[in-house]
């Protein structure tokens, strides 16, 4: 292994911190090439779909391996979209109609990543803060807030 331009990373960590006004969300995920995909889905679940941190981590996921993998043997499967079984059948059918090769993963698939996140949110008064956390059931994760 060496550190050099044009080489693949040995690790793919991608911790993130999202800031908006008084709110803060720290989140991260193990999962190789699925890390950023899983983190984006959890982020959108909280910010756009207004899910709680726990709901956001438990929500059904999709993942693609269309680019060559970061790890030997660098597998890539163009056009394949993995979807957890909780994605409704009519959605999967529409994805196939749009040209995707859909493979159904079991619910809470380990390979869909394991997002953990903590939100520090304003409460009812300016002096109060609320910590809310989510632990992904796909991995051995725990959430602890106060």
Language model features: what each stretch is:
Residues 89-146:
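In a subset of proteins, long, contiguous C-terminal domains/tails are tracked
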Residues 1-108:
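Proteins synthesized as precursors that undergo proteolytic processing into mature forms
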